[in-house]
UniProtKB/Swiss-Prot annotation:
Part of the 50S ribosomal subunit. It comes from Streptococcus pneumoniae serotype 4 (strain ATCC BAA-334 / TIGR4). It comes from the Bacteria. This is Large ribosomal subunit protein uL16. HAMAP family: Ribosomal_uL16. Keywords: Antibiotic resistance, Ribonucleoprotein, Ribosomal protein, RNA-binding, rRNA-binding, tRNA-binding. The gene is rplP. InterPro entries: Ribosomal_uL16, Ribosomal_uL16_bact-type, Ribosomal_uL16_CS, Ribosomal_uL16_dom, Ribosomal_uL16_sf.
Length: 137
């Protein structure tokens, strides 16, 4: 499970998710990628579930790059607690993903296997995704 080693502040503001991703919009390391077409928070558990779905389908073949990291903490108050009395306790970690960001990359497998592996991974994520290929140089 991906979590930061240490953070400066345990509780963060939620922030705004406006516009497109600034960087990481092209396939950089692998041959094929999974690009977000909507913006959302992706938890460390969802990233791990997507990684497992991809690697199980690829059966020890190829290489996977995870290009997002859950660095932002989110908080939640206990069930049945009334409003007020401060911010809730840290609940988990999320990676804010804006539209256009390539989240996962694959190399070393055929296009059919990569397409199916990334399709299986996309079902584990709360964003709409599309399959992208590396640009010819």
């Amino acid at each position: 499970m991906l979590v930061p080693k240490r953070v400066k502040h345990r509780r963060e503001f939620r922030g705004k998710m406006r516009g497109e991703a600034k960087g990481g919009k092209e396939v950089a390391f692998g041959e094929y990628g999974l690009q977000a077409t909507t913006s959302h928070w992706i938890t460390n558990r969802q990233i791990e579930a997507a990684r497992i779905a991809m690697t199980r389908y690829m059966k020890r073949g190829g290489k996977v790059w995870i290009k997002i990291f859950p660095h932002k903490s989110y908080t939640a108050k206990a069930i049945g607690v009334r409003m007020g009395s401060g911010k809730g306790a840290p609940e988990g970690w999320v990676a804010p993903v804006k539209r256009g960001k390539v989240m996962f990359e694959i190399a070393g497998v055929s296009e059919e296997i990569a397409r199916e592996a990334l399709r299986l991974a996309s079902h584990k994520l709360p964003v709409k995704c599309k399959f992208v290929k590396r640009e010819a140089e």
